């Protein structure tokens, strides 16, 4: 069975069409209206081997907040839907990714218990026109809607672009690991019998 999902979300602030294949080839077709976010999601898809398609229109004439947040919501919903009953998945994923001066770690548990922790400080408030505080907003909404336990640690770095890039690459790699089918796992990977 294909582990895919299509999500459509329209509000007074944004209109988003998103499709995701967990068992893809790392192909991304992205029109987010937020160039830096587009770049980060391209890296996420490539390093997670996900096929990701996004068409988003939002009130970016105000700022990038609503579009960034709503894409996080839609991507989280797509991950949850594509996983289905979660039978046979590894459930946990952990990735360290260096990017020049920066080192980031992302740890995931696809537990159906949404939680988000972020540790680290970005030296700059913006990368180009993008407000770096929106990275936190995006990741929190992603974790909430995917119903995952998501821990993000930026260990160090000097260049904010490199630090955020390391986070999104690590996010892709950790989610790829957590969503992989492990042939040794019979049913759902939980002693409760459900996730």
UniProtKB/Swiss-Prot annotation:
InterPro entries noted in UniProt: IGPD_sf, ImidazoleglycerolP_deHydtase, ImidazoleglycerP_deHydtase_CS, Ribosomal_Su5_D2-typ_SF
Claim: Cytoplasm is one of the keywords in the record: yes
Gene Ontology biological-process entries: L-histidine biosynthetic process
Pfam families according to UniProt: IGPD (PF00475)
EC supergroup of this enzyme: lyase
EC nos: 4.2.1.19
GO cellular component: cytoplasm
Pathway where it operates: Amino-acid biosynthesis; L-histidine biosynthesis; L-histidine from 5-phospho-alpha-D-ribose 1-diphosphate: step 6/9
Enzymatic reactions: D-erythro-1-(imidazol-4-yl)glycerol 3-phosphate = 3-(imidazol-4-yl)-2-oxopropyl phosphate + H2O
Main subcellular location of this protein, as a coarse class: cytoplasm
PROSITE patterns linked to this entry: IGP_DEHYDRATASE_1, IGP_DEHYDRATASE_2
Keyword entries, A-Z: Amino-acid biosynthesis, Cytoplasm, Histidine biosynthesis, Lyase
Gene3D superfamilies (UniProt xref): Imidazole glycerol phosphate dehydratase, domain 1
GO molecular function terms listed in the Swiss-Prot or TrEMBL record: imidazoleglycerol-phosphate dehydratase activity
Family to which this protein belongs: Belongs to the imidazoleglycerol-phosphate dehydratase family.
This protein's name: Imidazoleglycerol-phosphate dehydratase
Species of origin: Geobacillus kaustophilus (strain HTA426)
